[in-house]
Amino acid sequence: MDQPTNCEHIDNIKELTLPKDYVCEECIKTGDEWVHLRTCQTCGATLCCDASPNMHMTKHNHKTHHPVIISAEPGEQWMYCYPHDLFIDYE
């Protein structure tokens, strides 16, 4: 079966929420480091990725069930839907 190219969670995003700062909002509180950052498209939180020791964005998803994130990395233009395990590139 082919993987869908979009889902209702991604279709519901009318305007991207971009990161306000290039820091993990949780790691910065404890002085921890991160590898890459992601921005939640529901609430705008910018948190660290799964390659980072604390995996704050996945923890955020488990707690809030906010479905879609974007990469906050300069030059990267993709989003990810947690419920559908779906990556989508955008322009």
Regions flagged by a language model, labelled:
Residues Q3-I13, P19-E25, T30, T46-E91:
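Cys/His-rich, Zn2+-coordinating zinc-finger modules
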Residues D32-Q41:
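Canonical RING-type zinc finger of E3 ubiquitin-protein ligases
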